[in-house]
């Protein structure tokens, strides 16, 4: 199964060298094996910890490690792809048994994936994938564990079209440039609204999945496009920043501009209940149980799908109350 879910040009050997991969480096031909053990030393390379989604994901990992009595080597790249590559290299030097990597971006983390393979350490990509034209699941790393970001975008688009009556001038707040969720959520949403000519994305820019930057970017885009009637945001943090900007400008979220968002944080769920967000698509951050079970299954010799899919739900004001206790 193809992980990145979008067409990409095959990189040349020269392109790999530019990315920091040596043309002469001999990669291991097969995936590293994992011995069956009662206790594993697991490396978890987190991309950042600046939002509720990442904090919930990290806590899920820590809780599952504690539950199983395993050692978790945790690093936080603080939003830096270069640091995340360094973090993985440190884990390789520490000889962890297995690595769980949440890649900051698709291309820059490929060297880390390949170096783990060459060092004989199995690696799983979680939440985000790497560029499958350069490193493939089932060949270069065990599997991708995460949501279908294209489908998330599609679900947002389908429900949002219904909410706006198939007519809207949309500002899009994109996630981190070059990341798989940003790429795929944009594609899914665009695919979902292509049959509605009166639904148009009139402005689009990255807010880097951050609340403050999302607010700043939305303010600038809305000032440039006051005719906008809707906002599609790739995550809840940017949505909440945009809501603050709307309210500061004297606008009413949910009336002056309808909003579609992705993640499922407590703030966003409350905003749905309050009528400020029209459509909310879940992106489940609780990876611990599924990721750690995949490690056990791999050690047991079971066949691991190249894509272990997290299932996500959709929410509107009609059904949000049942989700509120689960929101993170």
Q: Which residues are covered by each model-predicted region?
A:
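A residue-level marker of the well-folded mature domains of exported/periplasmic proteins
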Residues: 8-10, 20, 26-328
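N-terminal secretory signal peptides and thylakoid transit peptides that target proteins
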Residues: 1-16
């Amino acid at each position: 199964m193809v992980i990145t879910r979008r067409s990409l040009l095959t990189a040349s050997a020269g392109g790999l060298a530019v990315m920091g991969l040596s043309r002469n480096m001999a990669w291991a031909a097969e995936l590293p094996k994992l011995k069956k053990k009662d206790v594993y030393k697991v490396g978890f390379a987190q991309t950042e910890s600046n939002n509720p989604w990442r904090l919930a994901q990290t806590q899920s990992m820590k809780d599952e490690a504690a539950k199983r009595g395993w050692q978790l080597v945790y690093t936080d790249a603080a939003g830096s792809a270069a640091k995340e590559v360094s973090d993985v290299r440190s884990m390789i030097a520490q000889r962890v048994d297995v690595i769980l990597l949440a890649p900051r971006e698709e291309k820059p983390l490929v060297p880390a994936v390949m170096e783990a393979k060459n060092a004989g350490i199995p690696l799983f990509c979680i939440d985000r994938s790497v560029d499958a034209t350069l490193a493939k699941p089932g060949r270069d790393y065990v599997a991708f564990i995460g949501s279908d970001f294209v489908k998330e975008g599609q679900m947002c688009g389908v429900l949002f079209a219904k909410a706006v009556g198939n007519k809207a001038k949309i500002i899009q707040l994109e996630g981190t440039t070059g990341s798989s969720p940003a790429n795929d959520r944009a594609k899914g949403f665009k695919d979902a609204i292509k049959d509605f000519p009166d639904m148009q994305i009139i402005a689009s820019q990255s807010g880097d999945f951050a609340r403050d930057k999302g607010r700043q970017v939305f303010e600038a885009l809305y000032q440039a496009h006051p005719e906008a009637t809707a906002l599609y945001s790739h995550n809840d943090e940017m949505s909440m920043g945009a809501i603050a900007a709307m309210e500061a400008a004297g606008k009413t979220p949910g009336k002056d501009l309808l909003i579609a968002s992705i993640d499922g944080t407590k703030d966003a769920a409350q905003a749905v209940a309050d009528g400020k967000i029209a459509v909310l698509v879940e992106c489940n951050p609780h990876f611990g149980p599924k990721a750690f079970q995949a490690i056990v299954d791999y050690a047991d010799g079971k066949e691991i799908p190249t894509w272990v899919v997290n299932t996500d739900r959709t929410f509107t004001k009609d059904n949000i109350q049942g989700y509120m206790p689960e929101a993170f």
